[in-house]
Amino acid sequence: MNATVHEIGHVGHSHLRTLWTEERSQPEMKHKILDNINSEGICTYIGFTAQHFAPAPDDKDYPMIDDPDRVRQAFKNSNLILSKVGQIPDEDIQKMSWDLGIQGRSYYVVGLTMCKLIDERLGRNTLIEVMSTGPRKWVRTYNQLADIDLQLSI
């Protein structure tokens, strides 16, 4: 049931994309990565907050946010991928993105951590506002709240 909640979140996130007011990041590959972290992040956060009615005892991502080393590594992986944009071929970035971001769960853990911090510190309305504006606004808002070693580069 919790996985269904996550996947339904993707439907809502697809609608949010139509409302984004910020210009797309350049280069395009950077925008795709930020969009992916944003999408997986909010959908993972939706599932995380739904555990009271849709338990997820076997979820891989939720326990990781309680492990500072795993969270730090997820941010390092995501920042590494972002740092390679424009330096290596897009096909290689897509492979890194798949291996580290998706299979390695970095995008899920980073995005969940970001949504959780914004929601806890600034409130649900602010989280909704920045999610409705676009991924760069979301990252900038999060980075203002986060420790330096847990910030996402844009």
Residue ranges and their predicted role:
Residues 12, 51, 119-123:
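Short alpha-helix boundary/capping elements
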Residues 7, 22-23, 28, 40, ...:
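Glutamate identity and glutamate-enriched acidic tracts
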Residues 5, 40-47, 112, 128:
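Extracytoplasmic/secreted envelope proteins and their assembly/folding machinery
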Residues 60-154:
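Pan-zinc metallopeptidase signature
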